[in-house]
Amino acid sequence: MSRLFITFLLLMACPTGSQAEALSREKIDGWLQHLGASDKFDASKGIDWGVMPGPFYTPELGLGIGTAVVGMYRPDPQDTTSQNSTLTLSGYASSTGAFGLSVKNYAFFDNDLWRVFVEGSMANTPTYYWGQGFHAGDKDNEKEKYTAQVLTLRPTIYRQLIDNVYLGAGWSLAAQNADEMDHDDLPKIESTPQGPSVFSSGASIDINWDDRDFVPNPRRGQYANFRYTHYAPGLGSDTRFDEFQLHYSHYHALSEKSVLAWEADGAFTQGDVPWSMMPLLGSDERMRGYYQGRYRDKNVVSSQLEYRRQLTWRHGIVAWVGAGTMGPSLSSLNNGRWLPTGGVGYRFEFKPRVNIRLDYGIGKGSSGFYFQVGEAF
């Protein structure tokens, strides 16, 4: 993240002297309200929108501009049982030619009897491919440079069975093309069975327990989820494979302003799994601090513990520790090699209980900044 953006955050968090007079919280609130960043939700607007732009810098993407658009709404204003629905759009463009757009929608209907969750993304990003497994990821001098052209979409409809228990049915689409490959590097992607272009399409079924008080930023509750996705040529996929996802997270309010959050997550695949669909050990949600895509394999397990503290006004901070491992089979997960992760982050409450987050994650021999909307988990 750029020094300009960090300086801006520090000025807001710690104004002194004439700065405090010139940049009073009331004035900043006034500026933010022009962007829709009110600290109160106005259901009469239909969708209560807010926009937050910000510069960033990373070694991979260079200098760029990111924008987060957050909308809060209630499909039925008379529904007092369901939590507020949220629609989040995040986009970026950088000096390296990278650009991307992602969307997340959490919608709650009929006194929380029905839920519709949609996640999607499109991106054109210069990146690297190391290969499968720890052995490949450790060979940094043998990675292949390419531009990832990615399109993903995962809609899911949930129906409540009993209190806090939901059954879901959905679809998963993922298209990835490796473009502009550096021919001076080893031809790793070209050597995969699927080649540079992969299309995966599959049907999924979920069952979960969810009593979180607010999905984008829980203060209390638990979330346990099992998802099975079957990809097959008959469903439009290039290859046939299965994906199993297990997740558990727990949120405990230590006080009115502090929360302890913990999660364990596993992604397990079998069959003819394409290189683009192998689970990753490293992202903006889990194992922060590792280059996304460096470590990938058929099976990945990780866990993290995060302390979240609300400060004065809109400010907050977090700190986390965690670890993860991976392997080509379930039995290989017990090989004893685990990668650590830890870091700290800043939170700015853009909409009621919807944070803009700036995280700095540290891994073994690597680190990274993350600028996103909503908590990591």
Where are the language model's segments positioned?
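Transmembrane beta-barrel architecture of outer-membrane proteins
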Residues: 48-50, 64, 98-100, 148-152, ...
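Solvent-exposed loop/turn segments connecting transmembrane beta-strands
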Residues: 55-66, 91-101, 111, 197-198, ...
